[in-house]
Amino acid sequence: MLQIGVVSGTRAQSVGELFVSMPDSLIPILPDSTLRADLLKSPGETLTNPFGGEVKVLSETEGTLRLALDSSTELELGLLSYKKRNYICLIATSTIVPAQSVVAFYDTEWHRMQEPLLEMPDAELFLTDRESNGVKSGLAEQGHLHWVASFNKDNPELLTLRITSYDDQTAHSLRPEIREKLHPVQMRWKRGRYVLYNNQR
């Protein structure tokens, strides 16, 4: 697995410790480090956040943490490393159909990285049939595409992206052929950023 350490080089920080030390401003739905620590001590149990929603840990590994912050919001943390520096990839996902993720990167002191470490691939890379002009034009007509991101359960260096715009019943009924030709795209952490995995172009 990855060798994760604090930037200062003192000792390794676990994904759970970084979650507990997360600035309250980044997680207003659970703005209490004590509550966050209690949550990790009781895996599988449900806690109530200050707004009355139920919070629980969905999965935790050495390099990833996935939580449900309420009935419609999930949060994932992944630990990444490059050139003796360590990074946190934070994925916040609204699961309301069509689901949408927001991805941000931080150092281990929770300073946000300004350079883009993930760029959304071209829409046609999500198609199983890239020769179909009708499907490609349908994607273009959709305009803004909703998408979700998720880590490989055991390895945050692998990230899966999936278009969710056609999970909506109305969009699906209008263009059912598009949803049938969509597939996820995998990204790999390489040289300090996520790039397309293998030969997906």
Segments predicted by a language model, with ranges:
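Bacterial N-terminal signal peptides
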Residues: 1-5
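Short aromatic loop motif centered on NTY/YTY
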Residues: 115-191, 195-201
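Surface-exposed loop/turn elements that mediate protein-protein interactions on large endomembrane-trafficking
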Residues: 53-66, 107-116, 189-193
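Terminal domain-start segments
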Residues: 11-80
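Mid-length scaffold segments of soluble, non-membrane domains
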Residues: 85-121
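Acidic/hydrophobic-patterned starts of short beta strands in beta-sheet-rich repeat architectures
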Residues: 83-93, 154-162
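Short, surface-exposed beta-strand/loop "edge" segments at domain boundaries and coil↔beta transitions
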Residues: 73-76, 97-101, 137, 168-173
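Short, solvent-exposed loop/turn segments at conserved positions within beta-propeller repeat blades
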Residues: 49-50, 97-99, 177-181
